[in-house]
Amino acid sequence: MNRPQGEPAKALRLPAALLYAEPLPEDLVEVGYVGAAYGIRGWIKVQPHADDASALLHARRWWLLSPPQAGLVAADAARSQPVCVKIAQSREHSGTVVAQAAGVADRNLAEALRGRRVWIRRADFPAPDEDEFYWVDLIGCNVSNEQGELLGEVSGLIDNGAHQILQVAFVQPDGKAGERLIPFVDAFLREVDTAGKRIVVDWGLDY
């Protein structure tokens, strides 16, 4: 039946089994977003935030959260409720990850999830190879040099295509915020202790 002209489309109500009412795990990390439905059987297509999608492919539970919206109204409250899905299968596909989630049985439900951010638990990440690190584990690490001088704290990372660069935040003598950009490469790295939140580099205060 055609909808009368001017009548707004009704939002699809998500099944109660998909809604997550418990407190969210404290170690959730955002790893991508649902870009579209994939096929007609409820598969979703996810655009990963990182080139390496191994964490997405490894995790069997995804939390799908709506992005923050200005002026959220009561009518949108149900759509903003967290969704938790169990992943039956997933695979890489042309720079994305396509996945079949239990309880998402058709394209309409998959479309209703479009735009949601995909979060997974840090505990569900696969173990990194030796001398490899996840960005999320580097954030918040104190950075010092071999002379014991504190250079600041890792606030972010940049990928320039050739290598990663640590964004190290510090307070300048005048009290203003400063930032050091230190290449995350063997030439400058001396020690990385993610458990102790500590990184030692060959880098001077005046660089």
Curated annotation (Swiss-Prot):
Belongs to the RimM family. GO terms for biological process: ribosomal small subunit biogenesis; rRNA processing. This is Ribosome maturation factor RimM. An accessory protein needed during the final step in the assembly of 30S ribosomal subunit, possibly for assembly of the head region. Essential for efficient processing of 16S rRNA. May be needed both before and after RbfA during the maturation of 16S rRNA. It has affinity for free ribosomal 30S subunits but not for 70S ribosomes. Gene3D superfamilies: PRC-barrel domain, RimM. GO terms for cellular component: cytoplasm; ribosome. The gene is rimM. Binds ribosomal protein uS19.
